């Protein structure tokens, strides 16, 4: 499971998800990407389940990049606990995702394989997503 090694504050305020992603909204490393269309908290377990689904489908070919990291702890109090007596203990870690954010990238596989792998990964996530291709400024260097 993904989580930070150390954090400055153990129990921060809960993060907001207003607005669109202004960073991380283009495919930069790979050729294909999976883009979020809704705001959400994505847990480290969901990221790991998506990663496993993708890598199992592409087998030994290609490379996968995870473009989000769960760096925010979400606290919870135990069940049937009276109110008060402080904030609960950190329960799990989330990545705050805004619409437009690229979640995963992939390279080294055909478009059909990438599309199917991303579809399998998207089923593990709690949001609507979209398959996107890399867009170069002056076209791709390999084309011509």
From Swiss-Prot:
Signal peptide: none annotated. HAMAP family: Ribosomal_uL16 (MF_01342). One of its GO terms (cellular component) is cytosolic large ribosomal subunit. Coiled coil: none annotated. Part of the 50S ribosomal subunit. Binds 23S rRNA and is also seen to make contacts with the A and possibly P site tRNAs. This is Large ribosomal subunit protein uL16. One of its GO terms (biological process) is translation. Pfam families: Ribosomal_L16 (PF00252). The keyword Cell inner membrane does not apply. Residues 1-25 are annotated as: Disordered. Keywords: Ribonucleoprotein, Ribosomal protein, RNA-binding, rRNA-binding, tRNA-binding. It comes from the Bacteria.
